[in-house]
Amino acid sequence: MAKKGIRYAVFGLLGANNTYTGGKYLAPVAAFNGTPNKSSVKDYGDDRCVEVSNETMGAALSVELTNDDLEIYAMLLGHTLTEGELVYNTDDEAPYVGTGAIGLSGKKWRAKFYKKVLFSEPNDENSTKQESTTFGHITLEGEAVPLEDGSWKIEKEFDTFDAAKTYLNGLVGITTTP
């Protein structure tokens, strides 16, 4: 089925027993892409390939946001936000989070959720206003790694967007919707 769009990206802080707290809506997303970290190894014997092992050990995640929100940076990257001032410190440690979004695949809404992600600092890209308006986006890059049980991503299909949204909210601990 053809994919048609992506929306409603959320995250929650990964806590004890692989549960999530402090869930938040990220921002409108222009892109939400995961590239699996794959490994393929071949074993040879008797002058031929006798076995192939394919493994996936997580994914590189790229989330393109249309909004630049200091509170989101503080939570995702471990920075300190006080009275509207975001302080970046070399000792800051980003927490592990779970993050997901909803896309339309054919006639079904598909919730995608990466279970354990560590985001890194986005590039600080700025440009001057020109003759025509251009919009700039922020791209957060992260690494999704497996939990102790080996799982690193889940997907679930729904008949409605609202059902998929309720599912993601439940995963990350969002009790009121934006």
Give the ranges of each region predicted by the language model.
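Short amphipathic beta-strand/extended segments with alternating polar/hydrophobic composition
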Residues: 21-26, 111-117, 154-158
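Short secondary-structure transition/capping segments
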Residues: 8-11, 109-111, 143-149
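Mixed-charge, glycine-accented linear interaction segment located at domain edges/termini
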Residues: 117-178
